[in-house]
């Protein structure tokens, strides 16, 4: 923990994120993908069922001994509260009721947030959209670990602690990297949670409150489902920055494991992502993936080559915004225009390093030179 770390220890690339290019290609090849886009009522159904189960469990545990309270807190509440936190992901993309019903999506987010005891559904949406816009951007991706995290959590013990404190890091990291003003919806979210917490504590007591609150803290920490925090973008195979997980825990987590699929098409509900994979197997079957989130956590801790620094970092989008004096992101139309220009200039080799890119350029120029020489020889023969 805390060993010397330099800029070269991070995985730097000089191309844009790969999903924009993939999305464009896939829609041209498989136009039927558009039929999967939209919203899915099952998201709301799963959220409401999970919230009801948590409220019933909060009533049940109030009369149990503490050892059973803690056991159920980790096993049941940890699993269900983590599932609800992942529902913020679907709701944040307006996949529960569609883009035409934003208020319904926000209300569902408030309901999903209740058992977690910590206001987060609105804030998650506010920052998560930027993760898609600026994936891997050194300045603007709120999901990237800070340099301090990468320096602090390097050893096996450090990486174990890194996983345990994920709930804190995920809450604080965006505020440090790309802080944004507090919104009215966030204040409403806070007031609703304070009222809910007070009701639980007053009417059901300490055990019920502990069951819910620590279900969030433990469930988002060292818990099997927390493997998705690591599996999604940490570099397990050189040259790839997004990974999918195809395991049974997807049933509890709105298919969040289908992460390559989600980044390719954020407007497709999680329930439909397996269908996307079936439609375009040539775009997914050849990619490295995970089948166990527990193994992901184990490998992350044990492998000395893996750590918080094992993320792709780039500056292509923030540099473009800087050059056009739009890095503050205030002028949305200007930002979108610049990002559209970046998308149009997206590199056709999105996963290559600087050295590999140089090699590709050399090969390209060599090919052109060979073509020119052959053309000259052919022309000379005719003369």
State the predicted function of each range.
Residues 1-78, 110, 114-211, 271, ...:
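Non-catalytic, topology-defining segments of multipass membrane proteins
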Residues 25-28, 103-107, 221, 225, ...:
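Generic alpha-helical secondary structure signal
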Residues 43, 74, 81-82, 185, ...:
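Alpha-helical hydrophobic/aromatic positions enriched in membrane-embedded helices and signal peptides
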Residues 78-88, 120-122, 167-171, 212-238, ...:
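Transmembrane alpha-helical segments that form the membrane-embedded catalytic/substrate-channel core
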Residues 81-98, 102, 123-136, 234-235, ...:
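Acidic (Asp/Glu-rich) catalytic motifs at the cytosolic membrane interface
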Residues 106-111, 240-254:
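Membrane-cytosol interface motif
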Residues 138, 238-239:
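A short beta-to-alpha transition loop/helix N-cap that caps and shapes the active-site region
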Residues 223, 258, 270-273, 277:
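Short amphipathic alpha-helical surface patches that serve as generic macromolecular interface elements
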């Amino acid at each position: 923990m805390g060993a010397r770390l330099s800029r070269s220890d991070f995985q730097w690339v000089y191309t844009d994120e790969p999903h924009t290019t993939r999305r464009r290609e896939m829609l041209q090849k498989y136009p039927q993908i558009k039929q999967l886009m939209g919203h899915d009522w099952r998201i709301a159904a799963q959220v409401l069922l999970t919230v009801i189960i948590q409220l019933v469990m909060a009533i049940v545990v109030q009369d149990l001994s503490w050892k059973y309270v803690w056991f159920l807190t980790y096993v049941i509440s940890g699993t269900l509260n983590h599932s609800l936190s992942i529902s913020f992901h679907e709701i944040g993309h307006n996949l529960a009721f569609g883009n035409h019903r934003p208020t319904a999506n926000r209300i569902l987010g408030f309901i999903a947030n209740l058992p977690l005891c910590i206001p987060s559904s609105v804030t998650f949406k506010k920052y998560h959209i930027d993760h898609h816009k600026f994936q891997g951007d050194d300045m603007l991706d709120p999901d990237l670990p800070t340099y301090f995290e990468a320096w602090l959590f390097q050893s096996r013990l450090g990486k174990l602690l890194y996983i345990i404190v994920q709930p804190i890091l995920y809450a604080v990291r965006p505020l440090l990297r790309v802080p944004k003003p507090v919104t009215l919806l966030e204040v409403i979210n806070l007031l609703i949670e304070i009222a809910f917490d007070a009701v639980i504590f007053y009417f059901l007591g300490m055990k019920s409150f502990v069951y819910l609150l620590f279900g969030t803290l433990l469930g988002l920490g060292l818990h099997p489902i927390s493997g998705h925090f690591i599996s999604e973008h940490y570099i397990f195979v050189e040259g790839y920055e997004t990974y999918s997980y195809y395991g049974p825990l997807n049933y509890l987590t709105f298919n969040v494991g289908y992460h390559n699929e989600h980044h390719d098409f954020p407007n497709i509900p999680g329930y439909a992502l397996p269908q996307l994979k079936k439609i375009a197997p040539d775009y997914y079957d050849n990619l490295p993936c995970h089948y166990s989130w527990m193994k992901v956590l184990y490998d992350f801790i044990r492998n000395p080559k893996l750590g918080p620094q094992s993320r792709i970092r780039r500056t292509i989008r923030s540099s473009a915004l800087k050059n056009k004096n739009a890095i503050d992101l205030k002028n949305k139309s200007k930002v979108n225009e610049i990002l559209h220009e970046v998308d149009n200039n997206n590199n056709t080799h999105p996963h290559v390093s600087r050295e590999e890119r140089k090699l590709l350029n050399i090969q390209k120029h060599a090919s052109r030179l060979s073509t020119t020489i052959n053309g000259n020889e052919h022309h000379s023969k005719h003369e």
